[in-house]
Regions:
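Non-transmembrane, aqueous-exposed alpha-helical and coiled segments at domain scale
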Residues: 1-281
Length: 281
């Protein structure tokens, strides 16, 4: 049995909140640079350069890359042999978000009631937390603060099995075209296929935060990732919607078994910043 204190978890979450808001992930930085060099459009190149310059300034000055520092999504993978001491795991995570957004001077974007009492909680809590219990004594946290300019562009559809591969392609392209410039492209896109109404959205989020350039382990899905990314970049939406061939930096797919009568599909859209940090304690 391995013990981890709540204070250790709180400190880790606080640090990740600040770093995720101010430091562009390395895979995103590499992808932006690569797409900049590949662009034919001078305006698209200039736009990508502005995005890279903005990220550099943010890191140097320890300021947010974007004013929308998002709602915090926290994914915890916890081994059965781990014992949390010193309080509640859930509250330790919430306190880390609270401290990170306060001490990092990050915008507080969470309202306490979605419809009637839309008053700000003033500390960006509650975070949305998911737990995955596994064997062993691992304890891994992924933090992915998500802005809602792109979140509002995400969609789910309960396709029929008869809709097949073409139905999935059509839906993904519809979501991207509906999003257009509103998702602050170039986008990072996660596609979930299978499971159920609730599971498929989790798959899409998991796919969205997967490393840019990685592929689904099954070759047919890996090929579909490449095909969809090419189709998206042929739309001409381009960086910030100004045209060009860089509408998306990445498209990843995650899958799960599903019912014989269904084929759920979800598309999770993220802006180019794609904030995420990981730590193992």
């Amino acid at each position: 049995m391995r013990e981890i204190t709540c204070s250790t978890i709180t400190d880790a979450i606080k640090k990740m909140c600040i770093e995720a808001a101010t430091i562009l992930p390395q895979d995103v930085e590499k992808a932006l640079s690569q797409k900049h060099d590949e662009e034919d459009s001078a305006l698209a190149q200039k736009t990508l350069q502005v995005l890279m310059d903005n990220a550099k300034l943010a890191q140097e000055k320890q300021m947010p890359i974007c004013q929308d520092t998002g709602m915090a999504f926290v994914y915890v993978t916890m081994g059965q042999e781990v014992h949390i001491t010193g309080g509640s795991l859930n509250e330790a995570i919430q306190e880390g978000v609270r401290q990170g957004y306060t001490e990092g001077y990050l915008r507080k974007s969470v309202v306490k009631d979605p419809l009637f009492e839309r008053t700000n909680t003033k500390d960006n809590t509650p975070a949305i937390i998911y737990y995955d219990i596994v064997e062993g004594d691992t304890f891994h946290i992924t933090l992915a603060p998500k802005g809602f300019g792109s979140e509002n562009m995400s969609q789910i559809k309960m396709l029929k099995p008869s809709d097949g591969l073409q139905g999935i392609k059509d839906f993904v392209m519809k979501v991207v075209n509906d999003a257009g410039p509103n998702a602050c492209p170039p986008m990072v896109i996660g596609v979930g296929i299978g499971g159920s109404f609730d599971k498929v959205t989790m798959l899409a989020k998991k796919a969205m935060i997967r490393e840019i350039g990685s592929h689904h382990p099954e070759q047919r899905y890996a090929s579909l990732e490449d095909e969809l990314l090419q189709m998206i970049n042929e739309t001409g939406i381009g960086p910030a919607g100004y045209g060009g061939k860089t509408t998306a930096l990445s498209l990843n797919i995650e899958t799960f078994p599903t019912h014989i009568a269904g084929m759920p599909v979800a598309v999770s859209i993220c802006c180019h910043v794609s904030r995420h940090k990981e730590v193992s304690l």
